[in-house]
Amino acid sequence: MTSVHSLGFPRIGHKRELKKALESFWSREIDEQELQSRAAQLRDRHWRIQQTCGMDLVPVGDFSLYDHMLDMSCTLGAIPPRYGFAGGQVGLDTFFAMARGSATQPAMEMTKWFDTNYHFIVPEFHEGMDFRLSSERLFDQVKEVQALGLKAKPVLVGPITYLWLGKEKDLNAEAHHDAQHHHDDSACHGHGAPIGAACFDRLTLLPKVLPVYAEILARLAEMGVEWVQIDEPALALDLPQEWVEALESAYQTLRRDKTPKVLLATYFDSVADHAKALKALPVAGVHLDLRRAPQQLNSFLSDYPADKVLSLGVVDGRNVWRADLDAALELLQPAHKQLGDRLWVAPSCSLLHTPVDLEQETELDAELKSWLSFSVQKLDEVAIIGRALKEGVESVAQELAAARAAVASRKSSPRIHNPAVAQRLEGLGQDDGRRKSPFPIREAAQRARFKLPAFPTTSIGSFPQTPEIRKARLQNRKGELSNADYQKAMEAEIALVVKEQERLGIDVPVHGEPERNDMVEYFGEQLAGFAFTRHGWVQSYGSRYVKPPLIFGDVSRPTPMTVAWSKYAQSLTQRPMKGMLTGPVTILQWSFVRDDQPRERTALQIALAIRDEVRDLIDAGIGIIQIDEPAYREGLPLKRKDWGHYLEWASRAFRISAQIAPDDVQIHTHMCYSEFNDILPAIAAMDADVITIETSRSQMELLDAFATFNYPNEIGPGVYDIHSPRVPSVEEMVGLMEKAVKVVPAERLWINPDCGLKTRKWAEVTPALENMVEAARQVRARHG
């Protein structure tokens, strides 16, 4: 009988219970026992939901208090020495120090999980390191599931993906870090090592890590586990041949008489290039993402082994649109005919990337709601498909008819298409969005206008969102606080932020964005073609959740979105106030995007809307405007052969949004969590006057490419990690800037934090910015 299953379920809870529990624990309002109790309640509820939806197997180990890659590091005992782990079981103090930093040690690096908006904690590897089983978490959770009478399917990050996504570290540099609080070229990665780094190949650690995987599988077998899901999404990347060969040897090594059956799960793109190898592996099944890469199916159906199941992901685990069940069944028919009961049906990937339950959305209009599907509904869709295959389409005729009607409604709705937007797009023609003058002319005009000191200081945009700010916003939404009183409250907060920046001596202040709930949602709420949920939260990292807008139709800007706030802030200071906008690619990447037209077309629609806002800010006297693009790299296709087209339209969308700016208006952009050394030409093609980037966690590693690539414009490398509560010292920030000066001309450097300060407390922000301004003074004295 065809099995239906889930690759993973959201951790956060229907009402963001995990976030509330974590933040209560971090602020010492609850103890570890209470935190673990609340986590267990969430897991119990999520497993029961999946059972109710009809899943034959429920995933175990997909739940994490912070990040599943961090869980894997702890399970394998891969704890960087700087955290003082003495062996045994990894405790929560060590776990959270690795994720968030501590009073004396910075956090581990964090980066995007493939091309999603989820972030994982990057494993650190050093030459000769040992691995050992150091966490009972997975086994404890298997016992929890078994106590419920459910069939557990433990989920592990596979050894190839785990090693590939990590970074090599030089322990000598780490020892220096312990003494000086900064690395000296301590990381090297398979995509090109920093200058001077002492490197080894992390693939050489595979023989050391495999025995721990084997031990885990043996323990699970002893517990009566029949199936284990081992995720190898790295296979969707352009893996070097030696890594592909390592995959084959690794799974041969893990083959044992008494181990559970292994379902090797791939997702996010095609793995057709590895079809022959995957079919030959000693595993009991393979999972394919047919939403991202339906064309790969034929490569697997050809000569698919008779002793393997084939799990096919036909319900989109990364977007919110209701599935076309007829199309899914049509796609599955050849596989079902060939494989019979050996065909399994699942979402394309873990449902980590979609909101929990559409039924919570009681305020969405009926038509739009009928087009949507969240995690619970996606499992229902998987179950319907499974029943259709097992019992025939007649058994689910009513469900199929409802899905068919929703798909037809969405295609024909007049809410989707706006002729005026189409006309503007056609008017662009081949215009690539170039500004009037090249950068050297613009730079001279901007320096004459603003007269900033060497190494000017600024922040990235947001300041702490205090409970008072959130309360005022909530009261305004509920109608308990009038718009006029809400405006007064926000203006008071803006005045406080501007005054504090003046006191600190920040050269280019910002208004702090108290009025913004989220850097994408805020704009989407004011753009036509967008819709919003009340409970559509997804995890970004740790306790940081986002509520992406839904882009369901053509995008346009009916009225100005930020002008009044920026104009008010500028009236409070003689310093140049920086206007703050979110760029078209980031709005696209951090939204749930319509799938009925190319993403490129939607991005250009957003770019034109942002350009309208830039024009109005300039008319209001704002001379420095930041157009954030932190998700620029995130949009890169996983395979390099597909990069060129994406980079071309993504850079063009940014340029079109900024094109209206005259020479003496300075356009900034910001990119956080980005590793973009290999796409610097495309970054330069965006032609922002100033780019600020996240560099402190990677200890300025991102700047290494500037030694060989003569980046033409100005740059602000982040000098402290805002994702950690730790306050960096003046010396630490001076040290980072000294590294920057070695590769970027001093006259082109800015000094700023890594990212916005929204999630931090004032008690952390004020001393950190004081130290940053003092660091700028010291660097100016040396180089200015």
UniProtKB/Swiss-Prot annotation:
Biological or metabolic pathway of the protein: Amino-acid biosynthesis; L-methionine biosynthesis via de novo pathway; L-methionine from L-homocysteine (MetE route): step 1/1
Protein residues bound to L-homocysteine: 460-462, 513, 628
Catalytic reaction equation(s): 5-methyltetrahydropteroyltri-L-glutamate + L-homocysteine = tetrahydropteroyltri-L-glutamate + L-methionine
Enzyme class: transferase
Family, per entry: Belongs to the vitamin-B12 independent methionine synthase family.
Functional note: Catalyzes the transfer of a methyl group from 5-methyltetrahydrofolate to homocysteine resulting in methionine formation.
Protein name: 5-methyltetrahydropteroyltriglutamate--homocysteine methyltransferase
Species assigned in the record: Acidithiobacillus ferrooxidans (strain ATCC 23270 / DSM 14882 / CIP 104768 / NCIMB 8455) (Ferrobacillus ferrooxidans (strain ATCC 23270))
